[in-house]
C-alpha cells in the first residue's frame, strides 16, 4: 500500500494525522500538490510538486496508482478514477468512497455543479469539525490495520 494525498485542498489537521499514521504504520506516503509545502523529515513521507493546471495533480496520482493504494481526496472524480484503478479512496471527513456509492456521489456533484452554473448559490461544505477528524482517523486506522495484517 502507498498513500497518495491530493494535498492542495487537504486540510492541515488531516495532513498531520496522515504524517503520524504513515510513520507509525511504516507506510510510504506521497503528497502531490502544485505548490510547495512543508513535510516532516521521514523516510516514509515524500512530496511531489506538479505544475499548475486543472487536474494536473489528480492525473499524476492516477498515473502512479497501484492496486490497493490509498488515495486521500475530497475530489469525487479523482476518487472515482482511483476506485476504477483498484485503489481505495477516503475523503478528509472520513467517508470511504466505494464502488457502491461513487456513482451517486458523482451524480450529486454534477447536479450541484449545474445548479451553481445556473446562478444558484449552493454554499460549500461545513468546516471540518472534531467529529470529522475523528471519523477520518478511525477509518484511516482501520485501513492501515487491515493492510498490516495482509503484509
UniProtKB/Swiss-Prot annotation:
Region feature Disordered, mapped onto this chain: 116-135
Cystine residue pairs: none
Superkingdom field: Bacteria
Similarity remark: Belongs to the UPF0178 family.
HAMAP family: UPF0178
NCBIfam families: PRK00124.1
Record-given protein name: UPF0178 protein Tcr_1995
Naturally occurring in which organism (per UniProt): Hydrogenovibrio crunogenus (strain DSM 25203 / XCL-2) (Thiomicrospira crunogena)
